[in-house]
C-alpha cells in the first residue's frame, strides 16, 4: 500500500502507510530508511525529517538502527540548511560508527560559521583518532583567530594565536606570511625579513605573495641590494616572483 501511494505521488499518505507498517513489523525499518532517503534526495526535507524522527522515537529500535536514523536525520538538517539542528544531530553521533563522518561534517559546519575555536577542537580530535593529518588546517584556524584578535586590537591574543598556528604546522606558509606582515605593520622590518626569509626557503611559490613587501622592507632598512640578490637567485631557481 505504501509503495502504491508513493508511486501515485501521495507522499503524506505513503509516509503514514510506511509508519504503520514499521510499527507492525520492525523488520520493515529498511523501507522506512529508503523512504526518508528518497524524500531527502527529492529535496522534501520536512518529510525526510518526519520519517527519521519517527524512527528515533521508537523504543524498540536496535541501537545500530537508532544510530543510523540519527545519522540520516543529521543529513536531513544539513541538506535543508538547518545548520544549528544539524550540528546538534551530528554531535549526538559521537562514539558511534558514524563518529568520523560526523566530525568531518561538524568541521565543515564550524568552517562555514567561522567558529574557528570549535574547528580547532574538532580537527584536533580527528587527528588524534588517526583520521588523517589536519595540521595545516589547524594552523589556518589559528591564523584566522589571530586576524580576529588583531581586528579587536588585542595584540597579545593575536600573538598567542599565531604562535599556536606555528606550533601546529611549523613549516606551513600562512603563519610565516602573517608573522612577516604583522612585523612590517609595526615597522619591525628586520623581523619581517627574517620571517619571509624562512618562507622564501621553505615555500618559494608562496613567497611570491609577499615579494614586493619583502623588497620594500629591505630597502627601508638599507638592505635593498642584498635583498635584490636573494630575489634574483630565487628567480634563477624557478620563476616564481614577478
Outline where the language-model segments fall:
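Short coil turns that delineate tetratricopeptide repeat
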Residues: 26, 60, 64, 97-98, ...
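Start-of-helix register in tetratricopeptide repeats
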Residues: 30, 64-68, 101, 136-140, ...
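Alpha-helical segment of the N-proximal tetratricopeptide repeat
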Residues: 1-27, 41-44, 75-79, 144-152
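Short, charge-rich amphipathic alpha-helical segments embedded
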Residues: 17-46, 95-108, 172-177, 181
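Structural register within alpha-helical repeat arrays
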Residues: 1, 35, 73, 106, ...
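Structured, soluble extracytoplasmic/luminal domains of envelope-associated proteins
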Residues: 36-85
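Alpha-helical repeat scaffolds
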Residues: 49-57, 83-94, 118-129, 154-166, ...
Amino acid at each position: 500500500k505504501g509503495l502504491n501511494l508513493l508511486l501515485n505521488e501521495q507522499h503524506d499518505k505513503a509516509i503514514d502507510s510506511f509508519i504503520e507498517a514499521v510499527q507492525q513489523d520492525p523488520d520493515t525499518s529498511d523501507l522506512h530508511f529508503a523512504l526518508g532517503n528518497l524524500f531527502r534526495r527529492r529535496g522534501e526535507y520536512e518529510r525526510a525529517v518526519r520519517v527519521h524522527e519517527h524512527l528515533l522515537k521508537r523504543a524498540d529500535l536496535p541501537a545500530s538502527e537508532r544510530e543510523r536514523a540519527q545519522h540520516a536525520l543529521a543529513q536531513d538538517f544539513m541538506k535543508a540548511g538547518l545548520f544549528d539542528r544539524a550540528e546538534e544531530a551530528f554531535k549526538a553521533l559521537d562514539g558511534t560508527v558514524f563518529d568520523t563522518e560526523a566530525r568531518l561534517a561538524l568541521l565543515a559546519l564550524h568552517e562555514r560559521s567561522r567558529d574557528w575555536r570549535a574547528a580547532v577542537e574538532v580537527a584536533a580530535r580527528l587527528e588524534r583518532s588517526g583520521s588523517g593529518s589536519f595540521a595545516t588546517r589547524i594552523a589556518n584556524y589559528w591564523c584566522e583567530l589571530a586576524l580576529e584578535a588583531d581586528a579587536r586590537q588585542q595584540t597579545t591574543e593575536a600573538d598567542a594565536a599565531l604562535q599556536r598556528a606555528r606550533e601546529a604546522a611549523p613549516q606551513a606558509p600562512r603563519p610565516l606570511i602573517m608573522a612577516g606582515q604583522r612585523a612590517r605593520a609595526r615597522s619591525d622590518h628586520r623581523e619581517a625579513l627574517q620571517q619571509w626569509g624562512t618562507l622564501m626557503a621553505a615555500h618559494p611559490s608562496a613567497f611570491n605573495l609577499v615579494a614586493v613587501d619583502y623588497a620594500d622592507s629591505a630597502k627601508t632598512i638599507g638592505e635593498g641590494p642584498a635583498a635584490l640578490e636573494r630575489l634574483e637567485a630565487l628567480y634563477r631557481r624557478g620563476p616564481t616572483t614577478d
